[in-house]
Amino acid sequence: MKSSELFNRAKTLMPGGVSSPVRAIKPYPFYVERAAGSHLTTVDGADLIDCCLGYGPLILGHAHPEVREAIERQLEKGWLYGTPTPLELDLAGIITGDHPAVEMVRFVSSGSEATMAAIRLARGYTGKQDIIKIEGGFHGAHDAVLVKAGSGATTLGVPDSAGVLADLTAHTRQVPYNDTEALEALLAGNDDVAAFILEPVMGNVGPVLPDDGYLADVREITAAHDVLLILDEVITGYRAGIGGAEVLYDVKPDLATFGKIIGGGLPIGAFGGRCDIMELVAPAGPVYQAGTFSGNPASLAAGYATLRHLHDHPEIYRRLDDATRAIGEAAADAGKGTFVRIGSLFKHFFRDAAPRDYREVKECDTEAFSRFWKAMLEAGIFLPPSQFETNFLSAAHTTQDIKQIAEAYGSCLFA
């Protein structure tokens, strides 16, 4: 069956015909038959260079041999036990070793679950009720953070979701990104704030980069007010380099959350931080968290193989940085909009200057982006289909892939 036929069938079986809203490309999404390296093959026979990469987890590309072999070895031994496994220690050891602020870690099944648990833990540790998030910051699809949320929520025009209780979101405050004065003012009038959760780089509407010194100032301000700092590294973890944004920007949070890359393309999440905080998590303490699939062996195997490969080949990060720089140079030569990148994350904003916060991102010309996205797809390049999502590269993207992406940029920006 062709993509259009599959989608017509899907709409009779699933809300909107998809399992996640961002996949509902108009007039219908393309369906993927297989993927390898940096390429996708659709059921319609199209071959596409993939700059979505499952929205970030696949930093080594699709079906990387070492990751595939690790999964296959684990599947031969079983894929769900309901008991601890040695693989938990392997992956936990790498994560805690790479992140100075993460002394202990708990595995869960998604990034959303990780941020949900981290917020609960912060409230349990401090005895306070309120949390602060960034306007447009996206921390998953759970109720406490579906307030002025980015990512697909902004794409669909529903940053504040129906069905979320006002009594709950009354305890979720927001400040603009890159605005320490707003943070200071909010904290000065509220002594019931448990935590400030933020993406160190706004990956779900961007990337939108922190001003020089912003994260250091945030750390100083939160510490002065006895507010826990939660770094959401679900996107930046192992994307920004070994040690993520914590190491890149030299900022030490109280708690951090992870997902995507640490599972090598299989479902996973994790939250971690200081021992005195983490030891409140059940069964060691009174903050309850549990899950049937937490620490799933197949996900742990894929994640460990991925992180081990990144450690063995640190040159991957330099090569990916060079690749996004080359694409950015082509975009600059075209002279339309603004190209922003950090490592293997990149995005073209249809506005005159790089945005500093969510409000400026929303000023982008989304119709121009839509024309650009369609032209890139016709040129054989799949980008996330929203002005409010980040593009990704992987170690599997070849020199020819990068050349093709850069050349397409030059013409497609004027679609």
From Swiss-Prot:
GO cellular component, one term: cytoplasm
Principal localisation: cytoplasm
EC number from the UniProt entry: 5.4.3.8
Enzyme class: isomerase
Gene Ontology molecular function: glutamate-1-semialdehyde 2,1-aminomutase activity; pyridoxal phosphate binding; transaminase activity
Catalyzed reaction equations: (S)-4-amino-5-oxopentanoate = 5-aminolevulinate
Gene3D superfamilies, alphabetized: Aspartate Aminotransferase, domain 1, Type I PLP-dependent aspartate aminotransferase-like (Major domain)
Required cofactor(s): pyridoxal 5'-phosphate
Keyword annotations: Cytoplasm, Isomerase, Porphyrin biosynthesis, Pyridoxal phosphate
Domain of life: Archaea
InterPro entries membership: 4pyrrol_synth_GluAld_NH2Trfase (IPR004639), Aminotrans_3 (IPR005814), Aminotrans_3_PPA_site (IPR049704), PyrdxlP-dep_Trfase (IPR015424), PyrdxlP-dep_Trfase_major (IPR015421), PyrdxlP-dep_Trfase_small (IPR015422)
Modification type N6-(pyridoxal phosphate)lysine: residues: K260
Compartments (UniProt record): Cytoplasm
Pfam family, one: Aminotran_3
A GO BP entry: protoporphyrinogen IX biosynthetic process
Pathway the protein takes part in: Porphyrin-containing compound metabolism; protoporphyrin-IX biosynthesis; 5-aminolevulinate from L-glutamyl-tRNA(Glu): step 2/2
Family: Belongs to the class-III pyridoxal-phosphate-dependent aminotransferase family. HemL subfamily.
Name the record gives this protein: Glutamate-1-semialdehyde 2,1-aminomutase
Lineage: Archaea, Methanobacteriati, Methanobacteriota, Stenosarchaea group, Methanomicrobia
